[in-house]
Amino acid sequence: QYWENINFLKKFRRSHVGAVDQQLLLDTLQELGQSTINQLPAHIFKDKTNVLKGIHQVWALVAKRMIACDLYCPLTAETVIWVNQNDAFARNI
C-alpha cells in the first residue's frame, strides 16, 4: 500500500500551490490539529470551485511532505492529515 500511495502522490509533486494558499492551509490545519483531505478545504473555502482547488492543493502539500498522513493506509478523501512537524524547519529556510 505504501508504494501505491507514493506513486499516487508523484503526480502532485510538481503542482504549484501559491504562498498565500499554502500558508492558509497549513495555518488552518495547525489550528485544527488534524482534519481530512476533504474537510480542510471545505472548512476554509465556501464555494465548490475553491474547495476542489483546495483538495488538489492539499494533495500537493502531502506530496511535498508539508502535510503528513499515514502512508501505510489507502489514501482517500477521508484520510486524516496533520501538519508535518518534522518538515517545519525546511519550510522556514
Label the model's feature ranges.
Residues 1-93:
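Electrostatic, structured charged patches in enzyme active sites and in nucleic-acid/phosphate-binding
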